[in-house]
Design a protein with these regions (language model features):
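Short, solvent-exposed coil/turn segments
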Residues: 14-15, 72, 253
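Conserved N-terminal alpha-helix of the aminotransferase class I/II PLP-enzyme fold
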Residues: 1-27, 62
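Conserved thiamine diphosphate
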Residues: 242-243, 258
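Short glycine/threonine-rich loop-to-helix capping motif typified by GTGT followed
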Residues: 219, 258-260
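Conserved glycine-rich beta-strand-loop-beta hairpin in the small C-terminal domain of fold type I
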Residues: 250-258
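Conserved PLP-enzyme active-site core in the AAT-like
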Residues: 25-225, 229, 235-238, 244-246
Length: 260
């Protein structure tokens, strides 16, 4: 059942707890759930890796939207990567203040052309942030990155990791769903936000999709491996045709995204 599935997710990703539900409809929904459940009015959200996905702009309130974090009095700060793709450590240090409650780190390049972050680099960034403010929550948007490397962000210090089952961990079989893994308190907060205070993870029909969640998760490493091989193959072909590709056919890969 769902309880065992969540224990499997927590164990595989090295987390204390997990929330894996079909009621989480997509990656953006999972991220919104994680943010809204762990931030309160007066808190500040910091992105030390530049602008997040376009879909998160309305969640945060960068673009005005009903129900955004901004509407609830949660502020947002952003530190862009340096031109060479490195972290702006000085800028990050200046941006962290007494209001900074949660730091969100987007692993994948997504729809941009900036470098995807390796788990090692994510760990270095988390260690730096924690050295300045140890109690800050470090959340990693792990979309497109699961099973690409042999370690995951939780194993290098992330307090919370979020992703979508219609990407890597669903193995192409999960028709819907998202996950949040990490510290027990963070996951519990998300569960109470998903359903209701006092109910949390105890309710919510699985609607017959649990088998596809298990099978997809079992197949996910193989499916991700195939996606990486296809991306490398496509990169080499388009390079030979004269196109600019990011990453190129020889670079180390930390997600399944290929830009042409």
């Amino acid at each position: 059942g769902r309880e065992t599935l969540e224990r499997v997710y927590a164990d595989c990703f090295g987390a204390e707890d997990a929330l894996v539900r079909p009621q989480i409809t997509c990656g953006t929904h999972a991220l919104a759930l994680a943010l809204m459940s762990n931030l309160r009015p007066g808190d500040e959200l910091l992105s030390p890796v530049g602008k997040p996905y376009d879909t998160l702009e309305e969640v945060i309130g960068i673009r005005p939207s009903k129900g955004s974090l901004a509407e609830y009095g949660i502020t947002y700060a952003q530190v862009d990567l340096l031109p060479d793709g490195e972290f702006d450590y000085d800028g990050i240090k200046k941006a962290i203040n007494e209001k900074t409650k949660l730091v969100t780190i987007q692993r994948s390049k997504g729809y941009a052309t900036r470098p995807t972050l390796s788990v090692k680099r994510i760990g270095e960034l988390i260690a730096f942030v924690k050295s300045i403010k140890p109690d800050v929550i470090c959340m990693v948007d792990n979309c497109y990155g699961e099973f690409v490397e042999d370690t995951e962000p939780i194993q290098v210090g992330a307090d919370m990791m979020v992703g979508s089952l219609i990407k890597n961990p669903g193995g192409g079989l999960a028709p819907i769903g998202g996950y949040i893994v990490g510290k027990k308190e963070c996951v519990e907060n998300a569960a109470y936000r998903l359903t209701s205070p006092g109910l949390g993870k105890e309710v919510g029909a699985s609607l017959g999709v649990i088998q596809s969640f298990y099978q997809g998760f079992f197949l996910a490493p193989t499916v991700v491996s195939g996606a990486l091989k296809g991306a490398i193959f496509a990169a080499k072909i388009y390079e030979k045709l004269g196109f600019k590709v990011v990453p190129d056919g020889t670079e180390s890969r930390h997600d399944i995204i290929q830009a042409v």
